[in-house]
């Protein structure tokens, strides 16, 4: 019933995009045999827990890609605030371009989730094993925190502000906006990352363009987070937790709903009128 496909595109190039929950439960055992470079038949021990070498590679890819994304996006905001040289549309382009680059860079390795909400969406849709989701979310959040620390040290030291997401109006308004734009983002991701009838090689452009559009119209209202890691990282570094719940609840709910909605309307066979 489960199947694994190999392809260079973002859609099918990663285990996380094409592996069902049933096969996901077998992945660790398969990795043990497929990775003779890892010690003890494929398992390595991290914090007292055995993990397959392949999964550690996936986690490292997620960490690095999320770090570079946050460094570019948060860095653009920081430069704009300090120098006024980027402009608001430039910030939107920076986020979208960074996402696009990372999708093409590590999509075939880890799936380029870059976002705990996206990981949740894939899990809800049966496209990612639930038991691996917490490790992905932890790697993504750690990367966002690390990027925030580096930017803070680069632009003023430990007392420098970190670009946080804050509501531009009522908390309820920002919550709704975050839900809607993350729903929109996850809906697009599901289309290009899981549907064989979509143009997979354009996935980076589609996802990056969606991010850019969302930032352009939702940025002044909610900050256009769409990503709990993006909000949690700067909040931890800056010790500012105002309305943080908005940027956790909204994206998680939106991604889950977006993944479910696309699964509902997805064409699974030949279309008949």
Curated annotation (Swiss-Prot):
Transmembrane domains' residue ranges: 59-79, 86-106, 133-155, 174-194, 198-218, 245-265
Topology with respect to the bilayer: Multi-pass membrane protein
Entry-linked InterPro entries: Aquaporin-like, Aquaporin_transptr, MIP, MIP_CS
Domain of life of the organism encoding this protein: Eukaryota
Record motif NPA 2, residues: 227-229
Keyword Kinase among UniProt keywords: no
Main location: membrane
Compartments (UniProt record): Membrane
Keywords, sorted A to Z: Membrane, Repeat, Transmembrane, Transmembrane helix, Transport
Entry's Gene Ontology cellular component terms: membrane
Family (UniProt): Belongs to the MIP/aquaporin (TC 1.A.8) family. NIP (TC 1.A.8.12) subfamily.
Domain remarks: Aquaporins contain two tandem repeats each containing three membrane-spanning domains and a pore-forming loop with the signature motif Asn-Pro-Ala (NPA).
Annotated function: Aquaporins facilitate the transport of water and small neutral solutes across cell membranes.
Identification of the protein by name: Aquaporin NIP1-4
Name of the gene: NIP1-4
């Amino acid at each position: 019933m489960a199947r694994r496909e190999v392809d260079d595109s973002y859609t099918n190039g990663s285990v996380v995009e094409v592996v069902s929950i049933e096969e996901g439960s077998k992945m660790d055992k398969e990795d043990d045999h497929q990775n003779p470079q890892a010690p003890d038949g494929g398992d390595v021990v991290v914090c007292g827990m055995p993990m397959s070498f392949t999964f550690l590679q996936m986690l490292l890819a997620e960490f690095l890609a999320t770090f570079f994304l946050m460094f570019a996006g948060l860095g653009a905001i920081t430069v704009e605030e300090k120098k006024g040289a980027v402009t608001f549309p430039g910030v939107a382009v920076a986020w979208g371009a960074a996402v696009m680059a990372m999708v093409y860079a590590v999509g075939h390795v880890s799936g380029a989730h870059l976002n705990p909400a996206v990981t949740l969406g894939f899990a809800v849709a049966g496209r990612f094993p639930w038991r691996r989701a917490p490790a992905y979310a932890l790697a993504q959040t750690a990367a966002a925190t690390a990027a925030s620390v580096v930017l803070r040290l680069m632009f003023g030291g430990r007392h420098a502000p970190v670009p946080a997401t804050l509501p531009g109006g009522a908390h309820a308004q920002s919550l709704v906006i975050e839900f809607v734009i993350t729903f929109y983002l996850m809906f697009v991701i599901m289309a290009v990352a899981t549907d064989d009838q979509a143009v997979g090689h354009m996935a980076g452009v589609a996802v990056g363009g969606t991010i850019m559009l969302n930032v352009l119209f939702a940025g002044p209202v909610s900050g256009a987070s769409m990503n709990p890691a993006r909000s949690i990282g700067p909040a931890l570094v800056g010790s500012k937790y105002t309305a943080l719940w908005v940027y956790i609840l909204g994206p998680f709910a939106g991604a889950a709903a977006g993944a479910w909605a696309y699964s509902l309307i997805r064409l699974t066979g030949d279309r008949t009128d």
